[in-house]
Every structure is written in C-alpha cells, then in structure tokens.
Amino acid sequence: MTTKDCGNHGGGGGGGTASRICGVIIGFIIIVLITIFLVWIILQPTKPRFILQDATVYAFNLSQPNLLTSNFQITIASRNRNSRIGIYYDRLHVYATYRNQQITLRTAIPPTYQGHKEDNVWSPFVYGNSVPIAPFNAVALGDEQNRGFVTLIIRADGRVRWKVGTLITGKYHLHVRCQAFINLADKAAGVHVGENAVKYMLINKCSVNV
C-alpha cells in the first residue's frame, strides 16, 4: 500500500484518517530500519572463522578416460567471533574442487544457529563416482599423484543471517574456501582408520567471504 493509495482509501472524510494511519505505519517502518542500521554500525559484525581440521580419504582413484572417483570425510570447524551477534547458517553445502573444477557432489549441512563466541564442528562426507575431469586437469592431477601430493579446495557455500538482540537480518551469501594438501604417497603421514582409509590432520585456516 502506497501513501497515495492510503490517501484515496475510503473516500471523503475517511481519507484523512487513512492517510494518518498510513503515515504512522510508514514512520514506524522507517524508525525500525534506522534502528537496525545504527545497531549494525555500532556492533560491526565480524564474519565467522573457519578451519579445515582433517580429511579422511576412503577413495581417490583416477581412471581412463579421465574419470575420478573420490570419497572423503572432512572435519570443518566454525567460530562466531562476535560477542553480541548470533549467526544463522542457512543452506550450507560442502564439496571439493580441483583447479576450479567440482569433483564431488554437494553435501548439505543442516541449518543451525551459532550463538555469541560459539563453535560448531561438522564432519560431512563428500564424494563423487566416476566424475568426468577436464583433460588438462586430469594431466595435472596425474602428475600430482605421481609426486605423491594432491592439492584440493574444500568449499562451503550457503547463506547466513545475523541476529542482533531480537532482530534478524536478511540473508547474506557465504563463501568458504579451504586448501587441503593431501600426502597420498606416504600413508605414514596420516592415521589408518580402516583397511583402506587414512586420516590426515590438516588444521588449515580457510578464507571466508560474506
């Protein structure tokens, strides 16, 4: 409903009353928006910190013609560094890429709320079966496998909302990028957690953009 609509509502003498009511509503909305803006500026929310703690490799096989089968379980930790602002994580998906090419399916992390100075730890599986790899990436990946070290990027994309007191903001895009250096040649570099599974401790700080 616009101010013009409010002025014409009801016709005759009722129009003035409707205009006043509409003016009060618009004024209230403006006050609320100004309040949110001022609170936002004063508190200055800080984006969360993410750390890739470890990766357990169950499978990582490159076969012809340029098909990659991989299966990981990763542990990723998030910390809300704000002392007065909570964070809602919405629609967060984790997956792996190699040289900007997605090599696993996206794994959804359940929506969650993170309070002030709180930590959350997730351990999702990310996997892909016979995923076609670009020929030039397959060559580079084969070279890395021959050297024993493979560099992947673990990504988390989603949306967050900030909670300031009883106020909750709109949704903001969240992009997390974590480098994973995996020593596939030396099994002793990790911990055997199964017949063919090796857990590698990483403790890598991730880049975060909101």
UniProtKB/Swiss-Prot annotation:
The keyword Membrane applies. It is a single-pass membrane protein. GO terms for biological process: defense response to other organism. Its main location: membrane. Keywords: Cell membrane, Glycoprotein, Membrane, Plant defense, Transmembrane, Transmembrane helix. It comes from the Eukaryota. Pfam families: LEA_2. It is found in: Cell membrane. GO terms for cellular component: plasma membrane. Expressed in leaves, stems and flowers, and, to a lower extent, in siliques and roots. Glycans are attached at N61. InterPro entries: LEA_2 (IPR004864), NDR1-like (IPR044839). The chain crosses the membrane at residues 23-43. Disulfide bonds: none annotated. Induction: Slightly up-regulated by spermine (Spm). May play a role in plant immunity. May form oligomers or be a component of larger protein complex in plasma membranes. This is NDR1/HIN1-like protein 12. It comes from Arabidopsis thaliana.
